[in-house]
């Protein structure tokens, strides 16, 4: 899992996101957001920090999920990363 967390952090930092980020915290937030949801495609919004909103574009499968796009809305600006690339 540590490698997955590092990949998440790397992709977010590459978007120009100006704040400290934990790949594990993002992964845990996604898991909390999708808990109990049916298979399908979703756009989920999460107040990741007091003044930061993360918008996840996720496809939920039987035993897994795919995070396509992540948009991070902060006072510093809007940052986006595509996890499918």
Residue ranges and their predicted role:
Residues 1-24:
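N-terminal trafficking/processing presequences and adjacent post-cleavage segments
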């Amino acid at each position: 899992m540590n490698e997955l967390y590092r990949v998440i952090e790397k992709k977010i930092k590459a978007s120009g996101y100006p704040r400290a980020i934990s790949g594990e915290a993002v992964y845990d937030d996604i898991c909390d957001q999708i808990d109990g949801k049916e298979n399908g495609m979703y756009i989920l919004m999460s107040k990741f920090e007091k003044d930061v909103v993360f918008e996840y574009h996720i496809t939920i499968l039987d035993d897994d999920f795919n995070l396509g796009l992540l948009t991070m809305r902060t006072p510093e600006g809007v940052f986006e990363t595509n996890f499918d690339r």
